[in-house]
Amino acid sequence: MAPRKPSKKVGPQKRPSAEKRVITSKKKQLRNQSFKSKVRTILKKFELAVQSGDVESISAGLRSVYSIADKAVKRGIFKKGKADRVKSRTSERACPAA
């Protein structure tokens, strides 16, 4: 048989699936870290509002904590139990101040 000629296709190079999994998992890890950081920041702002004792900022902070916890569950970053725990603890902190 005659030797095969190399094809002249120009396009994206194929990569092994294991390498692709590494790349996609790193992207997902960065996205998750960023979101978890956002959650921690909102929780810290809520704690500051509780310490200040301002009822309006406490209720706004509680709304934002509930919202971000539910978004984390929806995106698969938190499990439902963790989000429920976060919401329960923040509502406990808000009740004595309100």
Curated annotation (Swiss-Prot):
Listed SUPFAM superfamilies: Ribosomal protein S20 (SSF46992)
Gene Ontology process terms (BP): translation
Disordered: annotated segments: 1-31
One GO location term (cellular component): small ribosomal subunit
Keywords associated with the record: Ribonucleoprotein, Ribosomal protein, RNA-binding, rRNA-binding
Extent of Basic residues compositional bias: 1-12
Keyword RNA-binding set for record: yes
Gene3D superfamilies referenced in this protein's UniProt entry, alphabetically: Ribosomal protein S20
GO terms of molecular function: small ribosomal subunit rRNA binding; structural constituent of ribosome
Top-level taxon of the source organism: Bacteria
Transmembrane feature ranges: none
Keyword DNA repair included in the entry's annotation: no
InterPro entries: Ribosomal_bS20, Ribosomal_bS20_sf
Family indicated by similarity: Belongs to the bacterial ribosomal protein bS20 family.
Task performed by this protein: Binds directly to 16S ribosomal RNA.
Listed name of the protein: Small ribosomal subunit protein bS20
Provenance organism: Chlamydia trachomatis serovar D (strain ATCC VR-885 / DSM 19411 / UW-3/Cx)
Classification lineage: Bacteria, Pseudomonadati, Chlamydiota, Chlamydiia, Chlamydiales
